[in-house]
Design a protein with these regions (language model features):
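Structural motif
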Residues: 15-17, 81, 273
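Conserved Radical SAM active-site core
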Residues: 1-15, 19-32
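Alpha-helix termination/capping residues and helix-transition junctions
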Residues: 31, 99-100, 235, 244
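Radical SAM enzyme [4Fe-4S]-AdoMet core and its adjacent flexible, acidic
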Residues: 35-36, 40-187, 193-197, 205
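A short helix-loop-beta-strand connector motif used in the catalytic cores of GNAT acetyltransferases and
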Residues: 188-189, 232
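Flexible mid-to-C-terminal extensions adjoining Fe-S/redox cofactors in radical SAM and related proteins
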Residues: 175, 179-182, 199-200, 204-280
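Structural motif corresponding to alpha-helix initiation and N-cap regions
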Residues: 22-23, 46, 231, 235
């Protein structure tokens, strides 16, 4: 599959935890290097990997695999998802990446952990951070920079964010305001995902609407996908919410968190409330 889509001219982004990078896989990747590689790291020690993944040995395998992948001419980036079990490593992961793979690399953190839409062996609500810790984590890098520059007089309790009125700006004739969209993003417009059973949908998370790429063929499944989309009336609470500019909720997140496209996801709402407390 990989070789075929590469030969068709697709720009491939390869996402991996880097623990199963074998000589055979490297031989293929050297012949057909992906345009971009995203490596997921779940801790900065074997102990944390054991807590998060149940396999302490995966830590060294990740480092070894990452070193091999970094020899490719691909653009390489590192990412992580922080939950309760690896919160203690949130800064250490960034340090690990810079020490092993160079100062130019940083680590992208998942902004919000949503519930699983497919089978999962863990209860997301018991694993993910509280909204308070999640927001603080998202501001951590900025707070660390301020602390370094200000010095001993810095008090993170006094940090406030200036909030721009995005709605007001969008009403001033912005071209973005008039862009055609199905879900308010690129999903179903310039991007799609195909599931393991051949269902074409807007993204990996939003499975409420789909066409059958196996039965129809990829071209027709893509062309007819918009016809499968029938969105409900917008939630009035969300339409009138004063925190909408801060909201991380999209149709996919709503679907994952509530099981439908209309209800308010409580976790995202609480996240907004905490973020609002940091705003001027």
């Amino acid at each position: 599959i990989y070789e075929s889509i590469y030969r068709q001219g697709f720009m491939i982004s390869l996402y991996t935890n880097a623990t199963l990078v074998t000589p055979e896989i490297m031989e293929l990747l050297r012949k057909y290097p992906p345009h971009k590689i995203g490596i997921s790291i779940y801790g900065a020690s074997p102990e944390t990997y054991h807590k998060v993944c149940g396999n302490a040995a995966a830590f060294e395998k990740m480092l070894e695999g990452s070193r091999l992948l970094c020899t490719l001419p691909s653009v390489t980036e590192f990412r992580t998802t922080i939950i309760k079990d690896n919160l203690c490593d949130s800064r250490k992961i960034e340090k690990l990446v810079k020490e092993n793979f160079g100062e130019r690399h940083s680590v992208t953190q998942t902004r919000m952990v949503m519930k699983a839409v497919r089978g999962a062996c863990a209860d997301v609500e018991s694993c993910r951070l509280s909204p308070q810790d999640n927001v603080k984590l998202s501001l951590q890098k900025s707070i660390d920079i301020l602390r370094e520059r200000i010095g001993d007089g810095f008090d993170e309790n006094n940090v406030r964010i200036r909030q721009e009125n995005l709605k007001k700006n969008a009403d001033c004739g912005s071209a973005v305001n008039h862009r055609l969209s199905l879900f308010g993003c690129s999903g179903g417009m310039t991007a799609f995902a195909v599931t393991w059973e051949g269902k074409l949908q807007a993204c990996q998370t939003l499975g409420a609407f789909s066409t059958d790429a196996v039965e129809l063929g990829l071209k027709k499944a893509w062309e007819t996908f918009p016809l499968s989309v029938k969105l409900p009336e917008p939630n009035k609470k969300c339409l009138n919410c004063e925190m909408s500019d801060l909201c991380q909720s999209c149709y996919a997140l709503r679907y994952a968190e509530t099981g439908n496209l209309q209800d308010c996801p409580e976790y995202a709402c609480r996240d907004c409330e905490v973020m609002k407390s940091f705003c001027l």
